[in-house]
Amino acid sequence: MAAKDVKFGNDARVKMLRGVNVLADAVKVTLGPKGRNVVLDKSFGAPTITKDGVSVAREIELEDKFENMGAQMVKEVASKANDAAGDGTTTATVLAQSIITEGLKAVAAGMNPMDLKRGIDKAVAAAVEELKTLSVPCSDSKAIAQVGTISANSDETVGKLIAEAMDKVGKEGVITVEDGTGLQDELDVVEGMQFDRGYLSPYFINKPETGAVELESPFILLADKKISNIREMLPVLEAVAKAGKPLLIIAEDVEGEALATLVVNTMRGIVKVAAVKAPGFGDRRKAMLQDIATLTGGTVISEEIGMELEKSTLEDLGQAKRVVINKDTTTIIDGVGEESAIQGRVTQIRQQIEEATSDYDREKLQERVAKLAGGVAVIKVGAATEVEMKEKKARVEDALHATRAAVEEGVVAGGGVALIRVASKIAELKGQNEDQNVGIKVALRAMESPLRQIVLNCGEEPSVVANTVKSGDGNYGYNAATEEYGNMIDMGILDPTKVTRSALQYAASVAGLMITTECMVTDLPKGDAPDLGAAGGMGG
């Protein structure tokens, strides 16, 4: 086992604080509308330019192992805030740095670290409750656009684009961000349910100019099995041909004789048919087939529940107003399923989302809800160069997370004002002893740090602005973009409550642990291997 290097008490804490400061100083230059960029060197390709706090934090590794431990713990604050709310990473880092710096001063002055931590925790718990009372719901398109604009570093076009996307697909809809091909940002909205499976044979194409299959008012056959024998299909095909409507087959697979016969029938114009594979794999495929059945008012023909394909009738088939299939995707528009059945299915999936343990499962379930209840919007980010594209895409993703958080828990005044108002409301809070009171003061002082940093990045004097804002009340604050005072909500400077809350909670959590650190252990650096000299040969 490698030898260890151990540091105790103040020696350990000083090293740790140095690491915290290196990381936090690099991150906090990006805060606010006049925050600066950070350039990150990459081992290959062009450097990345970013104003995203967590992207900067993730790049930082320090040579000194004790300092690096401090930096990595603050990196955890940024990552956790990013995972919880998708934004607020820089605010969380600034808060953590302030709590750690002030807290360690108090420890050096002889305060009890555990009582300091209890005081900090008490102040943060009270602050979170106050934030909830300050929060106002964010429901209209204008407020959503303002939140998106602030989070995308004051880029109004991004805010408007996200508001438009949310307007079109609803609060439950899925919005994804992709690289665009032009210079302008574009919004692409997919109506109905779309899944990533294209036609099984190009001979099904009936719109050669677009290379797509379009079926008007088709019947939809859903089968949880491979279809290779055409005899199983004959009763359904005959019934559909009599009804004079097209047929879409969604099955695990359609192959061999069955596929060949369907192609021949389509080409001769006997019956208009298209076949696609069912989306997903394993249990997820079964669930998605059931979603499509609910949406189209059909039944999944599954041998697991004793149903046979030969015995299926038109009553078992789903229907939709229109289906469009290209080589990669199938879109079902306006299924005829009952609204109550669709809502029941959505409620059931939401329940599964609450019980899901992994982020991947949760994301996939959320997509299924969107396909049933809302729709899917794709924001295509346009830029002149690849470097700009990466930077802009990261900002759009941040803004998207922020608007989702705003819809979820509401918004508070931005620009660090909400935390200042919260701090003034809980200023009279008292702990059980004097050391806890110092902990409370440390937390209250830290709540001013985001506003101070925003002002500092503007080139103004933080203390003057902070005192002016404190002398006002309600949403009165400082608009750093225009350098004027006023009502932050009226000026459209909003922060999602969830982002502010998460930043404060995670910063206090990690900072509290660091203040109570008494010993640090790391591996000793390995020395160079001893030189063994040249091996002696056999004399000849």
Curated annotation (Swiss-Prot):
UniProt keywords, alphabetically: ATP-binding, Chaperone, Cytoplasm, Isomerase, Nucleotide-binding
Key word Isomerase present: yes
Annotated binding of ATP, by residue: 30-33, 51, 87-91, 415, 479-481, 495
GO cellular component terms attached to this protein's record: cytoplasm
Annotated compartments: Cytoplasm
Catalytic activity: ATP + H2O + a folded polypeptide = ADP + phosphate + an unfolded polypeptide
Transmembrane segments: none
Name of this protein: Chaperonin GroEL
Lineage: Bacteria, Pseudomonadati, Pseudomonadota, Gammaproteobacteria, Enterobacterales
